[in-house]
Amino acid sequence: MLILSVRYRLSILFLLTSFSLFAQNKTEVERSVSATAVPSAARAWLHETYASTPRLHWYLERSSGETSYEAKLRHRGAWHSVEFDEDGTLQDIEIIVGLSALPETARRGMAAYFDTTYTKHRIRKIQQQLTGPPEVVRAVVQGEPDEEVTYRYEVEFYGKNRRSKALWEGLFDDQGQLLERKRIVLRPTDNLMY
């Protein structure tokens, strides 16, 4: 009986820690900064990659204890968000896309996830995420296809099931399989009306 009890307790502990790692909270704070506050390596990479983009805005972002710099700009008709670490090294590029722009396999995989996990859901925003070596990502942004770039999809959605109703951010792979899910925590000042 004691052995069964210990196994039972270990199983419960494992399940609880697995769920807590899988569904963490996301609290993100952004504030506008001048270009001079951004590492020169980030500015140089951005200038080489998006040479013809006249306007861009820089932000300092704090999320989950990490600090990064983010440039937001419009390129070829789509909104791009380019994120760099504190040293100015490229982390990823996120491009706002519609559901129809996703590959069919990714759409089907996401639909299966939403249908089995939620009684109701509504997609708020989809961003195609590009990661890889900076020079390869640059080539893809400039229109050259490359196999070394990893494509993922960051999806903000409202989800409702028997247990909860919340705003979530899910990271899906190119097959539409959920890799990570975080509950988006809105600060009270995010919703102030003036």
Name these PLM-found stretches.
Residues 185-194:
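Acidic, serine/threonine-rich low-complexity disordered tracts
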Residues 80-92, 164-186:
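A short, surface-exposed beta-strand/turn
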Residues 117-132, 136-139, 149-154:
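Surface-exposed interaction/gating patches
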Residues 15-37, 111-120:
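N-terminal short leaders/motifs
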Residues 86-129:
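Long, charged/polar, surface-exposed segments that mediate recognition or autoinhibition
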Residues 50-83, 138-171:
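Exposed beta-strand-loop-beta-strand "reactive/processing" segments of non-cytosolic proteins
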Residues 1-27, 46:
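Bacterial Sec-dependent N-terminal signal peptides
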Residues 24-67, 74-78, 85-98:
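Short helix/turn-capping signatures at newly exposed starts of structured segments
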